[in-house]
Amino acid sequence: MRPLTPRQEEVLQLIKTTMLETGMPPTRAEIARHLGFKSANAAEEHLKALARKGAIEILPGTSRGIRLTEPLEDQLEDQGLPLIGRVAAGEPILAQEHVEMHYKVDPSLFKPSADFLLRVSGMSMKDIGILDGDLLAVHKTTDVHNGQVVVARVDEDVTVKRLERKGRQVVLHAENEDFQPIKVDLATQPFNIEGIAVGVIRNADWM
């Protein structure tokens, strides 16, 4: 199969996810709705591109006429790291509904190995090279130490910061002087560690 663009990867991942959840591929309208296309015609163009690259076959005469060229089970074993999008309050970060797509990145490239990717929002960690739009490789663990860059959940928000524990308080430090530390009172505020940062993939590398 020829290499896919990030948008084509999104469409292909949606097809796989829908087939896993419902047993059938999505319609063009469903693809357009899930991925924010203006029309089903836009979805059709992406499907044609996937067919040209050998990822799928298009079966004429039916709205769900999409067939994967490789068995779904084989692809799932090698689908790579999940990219986590917006995380809903109170739900596990790796819940299926949070997974936007998968990137074919070998988890063992990172030490310790990565469990998922998180898209960085904002420039609060720019001084250590973590920029807006980057993909942060994360090792899922709650065993963390002062000074590590962690992915933490504070109240309803997921944030990337450098950890400092002070008794019953946690301070999350930005790596940008324009941002103030986030102080968390463990006695009164919900707080969870989701993992530690183990690498960064520059956003432009995927465009």
Swiss-Prot record:
<dbReference type="GO" id="GO:0006260">
    <property type="term" value="P:DNA replication"/>
</dbReference>
<keyword id="KW-0235">DNA replication</keyword>
<dbReference type="GO" id="GO:0006281">
    <property type="term" value="P:DNA repair"/>
</dbReference>
<dbReference type="InterPro" id="IPR015927">
    <property type="entry name" value="Peptidase_S24_S26A/B/C"/>
</dbReference>
<comment type="function">
    <text>Represses a number of genes involved in the response to DNA damage (SOS response), including recA and lexA. In the presence of single-stranded DNA, RecA interacts with LexA causing an autocatalytic cleavage which disrupts the DNA-binding part of LexA, leading to derepression of the SOS regulon and eventually DNA repair.</text>
</comment>
<keyword id="KW-0804">Transcription</keyword>
<keyword id="KW-0238">DNA-binding</keyword>
<dbReference type="Pfam" id="PF01726">
    <property type="entry name" value="LexA_DNA_bind"/>
</dbReference>
<dbReference type="InterPro" id="IPR036390">
    <property type="entry name" value="WH_DNA-bd_sf"/>
</dbReference>
<keyword id="KW-0805">Transcription regulation</keyword>
<feature type="DNA-binding region" description="H-T-H motif">
    <location>
        <begin position="28"/>
        <end position="48"/>
    </location>
</feature>
<dbReference type="GO" id="GO:0004252">
    <property type="term" value="F:serine-type endopeptidase activity"/>
</dbReference>
<protein>
    <recommendedName>
        <fullName>LexA repressor</fullName>
        <ecNumber>3.4.21.88</ecNumber>
    </recommendedName>
</protein>
<dbReference type="Pfam" id="PF00717">
    <property type="entry name" value="Peptidase_S24"/>
</dbReference>
<feature type="active site" description="For autocatalytic cleavage activity">
    <location>
        <position position="124"/>
    </location>
</feature>
<dbReference type="GO" id="GO:0003677">
    <property type="term" value="F:DNA binding"/>
</dbReference>
<dbReference type="GO" id="GO:0009432">
    <property type="term" value="P:SOS response"/>
</dbReference>
<dbReference type="InterPro" id="IPR006197">
    <property type="entry name" value="Peptidase_S24_LexA"/>
</dbReference>
<keyword id="KW-0068">Autocatalytic cleavage</keyword>
<comment type="similarity">
    <text>Belongs to the peptidase S24 family.</text>
</comment>
<dbReference type="GO" id="GO:0006508">
    <property type="term" value="P:proteolysis"/>
</dbReference>
<keyword id="KW-0378">Hydrolase</keyword>
<dbReference type="InterPro" id="IPR036286">
    <property type="entry name" value="LexA/Signal_pep-like_sf"/>
</dbReference>
<keyword id="KW-0227">DNA damage</keyword>
<comment type="subunit">
    <text>Homodimer.</text>
</comment>
<keyword id="KW-0234">DNA repair</keyword>
<feature type="site" description="Cleavage; by autolysis">
    <location>
        <begin position="89"/>
        <end position="90"/>
    </location>
</feature>
<feature type="active site" description="For autocatalytic cleavage activity">
    <location>
        <position position="161"/>
    </location>
</feature>
<dbReference type="InterPro" id="IPR006200">
    <property type="entry name" value="LexA"/>
</dbReference>
<keyword id="KW-0678">Repressor</keyword>
<dbReference type="InterPro" id="IPR006199">
    <property type="entry name" value="LexA_DNA-bd_dom"/>
</dbReference>
<dbReference type="GO" id="GO:0045892">
    <property type="term" value="P:negative regulation of DNA-templated transcription"/>
</dbReference>
<dbReference type="InterPro" id="IPR036388">
    <property type="entry name" value="WH-like_DNA-bd_sf"/>
</dbReference>
<dbReference type="InterPro" id="IPR050077">
    <property type="entry name" value="LexA_repressor"/>
</dbReference>
<keyword id="KW-0742">SOS response</keyword>
<dbReference type="InterPro" id="IPR039418">
    <property type="entry name" value="LexA-like"/>
</dbReference>
